[in-house]
């Protein structure tokens, strides 16, 4: 028995691949990885001991491109698919798991050509174009969101690494705020952090700001101009996001699915600013259920005024009918919403199929 994991591009997809790879390793099952040279796949897995072999194809996405660029991207995908077909055959792969993203294309299609059972994890509440096409052809589609077209869909807990649960805690007071722009940074969140930093630090609230590598020097300059560089923990990227989340009492974040569920597992109340240009507005739908259950605050990017942060802080400090702070109630309920061992459930479901 040997698995192939494929897909990625961004940290959200790749964190799922990592969680599944860790579970396969625990169960003593060998796995290889197939991704792309474009995006973050190499950064995550080029030297990862979780995989016996790693392959990166020269591929790019097709969505939101001009006609001729789409043709070029499809040609690269097709070329890579035939390479992937040989790789899967040579490794005698028995199961393929796609975590989505454009880099999942070649190995997913190669698996279908080789008649290898294909399993898909759909991380978002709205399916991406590749998963929409491949879902009917897959053995099963795992997701933490309920889809209307149930078919071969399996509802599971999100495959969050156990460390996020292990470092969870119930928040009782807002002493530390984390501004989290995602793996690629977020200009709107960066500016929101800068505008609120003077008042927050004046009130004695600590700030950790992960701004993305492209904005790091600029953010450093602005904090220095504000005289706050020594009062703000500023990072382009942080290797231990679990520890950073654990220390925070409130988070401001995009609404990529992996971030949403990791914050949930950690019990960290969050203000979500969905990326407005995400395909099919999927980031908004990722947190819609949370918002309906009063487990988060959602602020559209075009309404992101500095006063919004303090409005939310004020609401979180108010007490509910039982005399508990809303902050504490939300933190407690978040930890109850997601079950541990989502990755284990997915792997065992596949093995028992």
From Swiss-Prot:
The keyword Cell wall biogenesis/degradation applies. Disulfide bonds: none annotated. GO terms for molecular function: UDP-N-acetyl-D-glucosamine:N-acetylmuramoyl-L-alanyl-D-glutamyl-meso-2,6-diaminopimelyl-D-alanyl-D-alanine-diphosphoundecaprenol 4-beta-N-acetylglucosaminlytransferase activity; undecaprenyldiphospho-muramoylpentapeptide beta-N-acetylglucosaminyltransferase activity. Pathway: Cell wall biogenesis; peptidoglycan biosynthesis. GO terms for cellular component: plasma membrane. Pfam families: Glyco_tran_28_C (PF04101), Glyco_transf_28 (PF03033). It is found in: Cell inner membrane. Its EC number is 2.4.1.227. NCBIfam families: murG. Cell wall formation. Catalyzes the transfer of a GlcNAc subunit on undecaprenyl-pyrophosphoryl-MurNAc-pentapeptide (lipid intermediate I) to form undecaprenyl-pyrophosphoryl-MurNAc-(pentapeptide)GlcNAc (lipid intermediate II). This is UDP-N-acetylglucosamine--N-acetylmuramyl-(pentapeptide) pyrophosphoryl-undecaprenol N-acetylglucosamine transferase. It comes from Helicobacter pylori (strain G27).
């Amino acid at each position: 028995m040997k698995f192939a994991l494929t897909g990625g591009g961004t940290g959200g997809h790749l964190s799922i691949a990592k969680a599944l790879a860790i579970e396969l390793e625990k169960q003593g099952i060998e796995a290889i990885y197939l991704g792309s040279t474009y995006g973050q796949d190499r950064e995550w897995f080029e030297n990862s001991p979780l995989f016996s072999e790693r392959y990166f194809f020269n591929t790019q996405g097709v969505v939101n491109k001009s006609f001729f660029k789409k043709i070029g991207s499809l040609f690269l995908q097709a070329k890579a698919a035939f390479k992937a077909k040989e790789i899967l055959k040579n490794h005698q792969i028995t199961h393929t798991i796609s975590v989505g993203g454009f880099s999942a294309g070649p190995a997913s299609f190669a698996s279908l050509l080789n008649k290898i059972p294909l399993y898909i994890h759909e991380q978002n509440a709205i399916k991406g174009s590749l998963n929409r096409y491949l879902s009917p052809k897959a053995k099963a589609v795992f997701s933490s969101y309920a889809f209307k077209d149930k078919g071969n869909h399996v509802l599971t807990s999100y495959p969050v690494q156990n460390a996020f649960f292990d470092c969870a805690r119930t928040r009782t007071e807002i002493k530390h705020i984390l501004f989290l722009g995602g793996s690629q940074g977020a200009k709107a969140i960066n500016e929101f952090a800068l505008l609120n930093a003077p008042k927050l630090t004046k009130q004695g609230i600590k700030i950790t700001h992960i701004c993305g590598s492209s904005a790091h020097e600029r953010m450093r300059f602005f904090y220095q101009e504000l005289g706050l560089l020594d009062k703000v923990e500023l990072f382009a990227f942080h290797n231990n996001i679990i520890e950073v989340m654990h220390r925070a009492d409130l988070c401001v974040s995009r609404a990529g699915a992996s971030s949403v569920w990791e914050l949930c597992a950690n019990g960290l109340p969050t203000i979500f600013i969905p990326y407005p240009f995400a395909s099919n507005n999927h980031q908004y739908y990722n947190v819609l259920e949370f918002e309906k259950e009063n487990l988060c605050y959602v602020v559209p990017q075009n309404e992101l005024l500095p006063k919004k942060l303090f409005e939310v802080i004020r609401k979180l400090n108010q007490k509910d009918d039982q005399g508990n702070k809303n902050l504490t109630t939300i933190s407690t309920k978040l930890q109850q919403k997601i079950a541990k061992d989502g990755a284990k459930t997915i792997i065992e479901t596949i093995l028992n199929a």
